[in-house]
């Protein structure tokens, strides 16, 4: 069993920004092992647990496959055989697909560190198109990181336009749209 810090906490630390939520990824473990260690399972659709002392989130490594439209209809597969690289591949942006192991070593199979240095928001894989909520997430990140000089990669913008033209945003619920818009509006640069 190997535990990694993933997502925004790693990204923000590398940018020298305050870290928010600390999400952890667990590779090589089962639900039963996590429960035996005292974790509390909170995820319905995929195995997410709360640490018994810190209450931070720990998710088992998983892959996702889309079956349907909108941001629902994902089939998640979590098992001890899912690798770190497979889990990171399902993430939205390269800058969010960086993991830090317990020894402080960074694992960056998709070029997130280089994109941080270049100030580029780029999708990890074509699977980005499977979740239209990611369009709004990219808009939120573009607004949030505008002051640091970040731009959306041309190929990511093109993919977002294709998704919009295909009507994918129409499949989002108003609650999910509002949640993302609220995060933009409450940010430091909502006008971007």
Curated annotation (Swiss-Prot):
Residues annotated for ATP binding in this entry: 8, 11, 91, 137, 140
UniProt GO MF annotations: ATP binding; CCA tRNA nucleotidyltransferase activity; metal ion binding; RNA binding
Needed cofactors: Mg(2+)
SS bonds (residue pairs): none
UniProt xrefs under Gene3D superfamilies: Beta Polymerase, domain 2, cca-adding enzyme, domain 2
Broad class of enzyme this protein falls into: transferase
Domain of life: Bacteria
Residue numbers binding Mg(2+): 21, 23
GO biological process: RNA repair; tRNA processing
Catalyzed reaction equations: a tRNA precursor + 2 CTP + ATP = a tRNA with a 3' CCA end + 3 diphosphate; a tRNA with a 3' CCA end + 2 CTP + ATP = a tRNA with a 3' CCACCA end + 3 diphosphate
Pfam family, one: PolyA_pol_RNAbd
Binding residues annotated for CTP, in chain numbering: 8, 11, 91, 137, 140
Membrane-spanning segments: none
Record key words, sorted: ATP-binding, Magnesium, Metal-binding, Nucleotide-binding, Nucleotidyltransferase, RNA repair, RNA-binding, Transferase, tRNA processing
EC id: 2.7.7.72
Family: Belongs to the tRNA nucleotidyltransferase/poly(A) polymerase family. Bacterial CCA-adding enzyme type 2 subfamily.
Binding partners and assembly: Homodimer.
UniProt function note: Catalyzes the addition and repair of the essential 3'-terminal CCA sequence in tRNAs without using a nucleic acid template. Adds these three nucleotides in the order of C, C, and A to the tRNA nucleotide-73, using CTP and ATP as substrates and producing inorganic pyrophosphate. tRNA 3'-terminal CCA addition is required both for tRNA processing and repair. Also involved in tRNA surveillance by mediating tandem CCA addition to generate a CCACCA at the 3' terminus of unstable tRNAs. While stable tRNAs receive only 3'-terminal CCA, unstable tRNAs are marked with CCACCA and rapidly degraded.
Protein's name according to its UniProt entry: CCA-adding enzyme
Protein's organism: Aeromonas hydrophila
Organism phylogeny: Bacteria, Pseudomonadati, Pseudomonadota, Gammaproteobacteria, Aeromonadales
């Amino acid at each position: 069993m190997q535990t990694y810090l993933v997502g925004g906490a790693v990204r923000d630390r590398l940018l020298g920004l305050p870290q928010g939520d600390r999400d952890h990824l667990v590779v090589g473990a089962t639900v039963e092992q996590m429960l035996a260690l005292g974790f509390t399972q909170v995820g319905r659709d995929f195995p997410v647990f709360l640490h018994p002392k810190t209450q931070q989130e720990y998710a088992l490594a998983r892959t996702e496959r889309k079956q349907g439209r909108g941001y629902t209809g994902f089939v998640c597969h979590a098992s001890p055989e899912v690798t770190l690289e497979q889990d990171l591949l399902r993430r939205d942006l390269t800058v969010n697909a960086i993991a830090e192991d317990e020894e402080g070593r960074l694992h960056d199979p998709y070029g997130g560190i280089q994109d941080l240095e270049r100030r580029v928001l780029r999708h990890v894989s074509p699977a980005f198109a499977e979740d239209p909520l990611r369009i709004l997430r990219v808009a939120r990140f573009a607004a949030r990181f505008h002051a640091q000089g970040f731009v959306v990669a041309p190929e990511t913008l093109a993919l977002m336009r294709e998704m919009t033209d295909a009507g994918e945003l129409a499949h989002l619920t108003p609650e999910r749209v509002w949640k993302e818009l609220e995060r933009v509006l409450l940010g430091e640069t909502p006008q971007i």
